[in-house]
Amino acid sequence: IDLIPDLLVIPVENLKNTLWFDETNLPWIKPSPNIPDLETAIIYPGMCLLEATNLNEGRGTYKPFKQFGAPWIDKQELSIALNNLNLSGVTFKPVSYTPISIKGMSNNPRFKDEKCEGVELILTNRNAYNSVDIGIAALKTVKNLYPEKLKFNSDWMDKLWGESGLSYQL
């Protein structure tokens, strides 16, 4: 960057960093069409990594990032494998769903009009939930169960992750 602008940080008065957004009594404004609520915002930082794979990340449903799957996944097998990891703050429920075009959310989701099997993430303790760890665990588990099926777009994964190599490390 050739020209660095002046930056002025204005502190927020009476802000308590211990509060979740829904504890502030402020209205929720969607930061993205596919982040309709706080729970999705909590889940998103880790589950957005699925965008760099051939998995459906819940787009084309009314639960984007809260569920994921593909036509080649066995929902029971994946649910059991993920729940056996005993990850903090989350359980995984087996689900079947069919991604569709949803105006204003997802025009052409991956596996549009195809039945997908996968899991829905159920937050059980948002204070214990580590979004990025969960996203990595989900990717590792799918890769272990379906090594010939899961594909990565390494360039996109590098951009999402912030450095190169994650798709190879999994």
Features from the language model and the residues they span:
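Glycine-rich, aromatic-lined ligand/substrate-binding cores of catalytic
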Residues: 15-100
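Conserved functional hotspot residues or short segments at active or partner-binding sites
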Residues: 69-170
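Short gly/pro-enriched beta-turn/loop segments at secondary-structure junctions
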Residues: 2-4, 58-62, 114-116
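Conserved, well-structured core segments that form the ligand-binding/active-site neighborhood
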Residues: 1-13
